[in-house]
Amino acid sequence: MKYEMIREIFNQCSNNQMRDVFVSEVDTEDPELVLMNYIKTKEEIIDKTIHPDGTVIFNVVCSGLRQRYSFTPDD
């Protein structure tokens, strides 16, 4: 299955609310396997949300940085 993956890295600096955003297309049956290429352990996953439209969102803290990975099915 193809997904649009959006990786957001939140800036922790005060007065700078911009975040780094990376968009890519991935082909996988399990978005969590793709996520594990970016993080070290499953313990870094804070929560996982599955929306009715099939979108899977992971909130993680990796190396002290808060990140969000969104996988939206590409119909």
Locate each region found by the language model:
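N-terminal acidic leader/helix
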Residues: 2-32
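Short, surface-exposed beta-edge/turn micro-motifs
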Residues: 1-2, 55
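A short, charged, amphipathic alpha-helix used as a generic interaction element across diverse proteins
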Residues: 29-47
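Short, mixed-charge low-complexity intrinsically disordered segments
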Residues: 41-75
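Hydrophobic alpha-helical membrane-spanning segments
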Residues: 5, 30-35, 67-75
